[in-house]
Amino acid sequence: MSHLAELVANATAAINQASDVAALDNVRVEYLGKKGHLTLQMTTLRELPPEERPAAGAVINEAKEQVQQALNARKSDLESAALNARLAEETIDVSLPGRRIENGGLHPVTRTIDRIESFFGELGFTVATGPEIEDDYHNFDALNIPGHHPARADHDTFWFDATRLLRTQTSGVQIRTMKEQAPPIRIIAPGRVYRNDYDQTHTPMFHQMEGLIVDKNISFTNLKGTLHDFLNNFFEEDLQVRFRPSYFPFTEPSAEVDVMGKNGKWLEVLGCGMVHPNVLRNVGIDPEIYSGFAFGMGMERLTMLRYGVTDLRAFFENDLRFLKQFK
């Protein structure tokens, strides 16, 4: 047992010389491991008389405890030194400019909606909204679309039941506004609409913008002038515009509006017309006193024409390579 002090001294010296945690662990194994120098001292107890073994065992355990405490202290010192060294290497130069956060960008359809709202806002139009789950009265009946009209067919409309559907147009917003507000009325109604169609130029969900004016002495001339100014503003050029006679149940007379494309061909951009007298009567407005015009346009189609996009579905595929072009 006399050489225990020497083993402890040797272990302490080795501990102090360990330059890293790995070397320190080797010292631990050498002295305190299963076959370590101090651990093997316990096997010498069987050579002693039984009455001396407890005292001798206590001395060995005390020696092991001294070495373990030295190991713990040295490990703490080595870990602190390693941490300080790493912190010194990773010091942040606060004088350097920070990393620039990449700015997001508006979706091209959102850009179109904002641009149109801005234009009509300057003309005194206010933005009105309504529910996307609509009833057949506001989506069809009040708009002079009777039960036998093809637009009410299952293959064109997403029906929940006999009376509820996903709105096929934002015209229901016009009906609600005219019921709640007395003329003069001047609104635009942007929003999502739903139709059972999917191809290169159609998707089951798309964005529509409708406009409505109801007042005294509103004429088709007012309609033409408003839309002509809008199209020139939106496309930022003096366009050749054509109003082509058409049919919509809720307007009379009705027209589709075309602009001359760069390829020399007419391109349809929106539909419009004078509010049908039956629609005015349905909302309690006297068509003998008031008149109005309405127009509607697809936001995706206008965006395609403005930016030269050929496939409408690209707006909904979330391809960043496509969307980043519009930042």
UniProtKB/Swiss-Prot annotation:
Residues at which Mg(2+) binds: 252
Entry's family note: Belongs to the class-II aminoacyl-tRNA synthetase family. Phe-tRNA synthetase alpha subunit type 1 subfamily.
EC category: ligase
Cofactors, names only: Mg(2+)
Cofactor, how bound (note): Binds 2 magnesium ions per tetramer.
InterPro entries the UniProt entry points to: aa-tRNA-synth_II, aa-tRNA-synth_II/BPL/LPL, Phe-tRNA-synth_IIc_asu, Phe-tRNA_ligase_II_N, Phe_tRNA_ligase_alpha1_bac, Phenylalanyl-tRNA_Synthase, tRNA-bd_arm
Signal peptide (residue range): none
Protein name: Phenylalanine--tRNA ligase alpha subunit
GO BP term, example: phenylalanyl-tRNA aminoacylation
Cell location: Cytoplasm
GO cellular component labels: cytoplasm
Entry's Gene Ontology molecular function annotations: ATP binding; magnesium ion binding; phenylalanine-tRNA ligase activity; tRNA binding
Catalyzed chemical reaction(s): tRNA(Phe) + L-phenylalanine + ATP = L-phenylalanyl-tRNA(Phe) + AMP + diphosphate + H(+)
EC number: 6.1.1.20
Alphabetized PROSITE patterns for the sequence: AA_TRNA_LIGASE_II
UniProt subunit comment: Tetramer of two alpha and two beta subunits.
Alphabetized Pfam families for the sequence: Phe_tRNA-synt_N (PF02912), tRNA-synt_2d (PF01409)
Annotated source species: Enterobacter sp. (strain 638)
Database matches in CDD domains: PheRS_alpha_core
Record keywords, A-Z: Aminoacyl-tRNA synthetase, ATP-binding, Cytoplasm, Ligase, Magnesium, Metal-binding, Nucleotide-binding, Protein biosynthesis
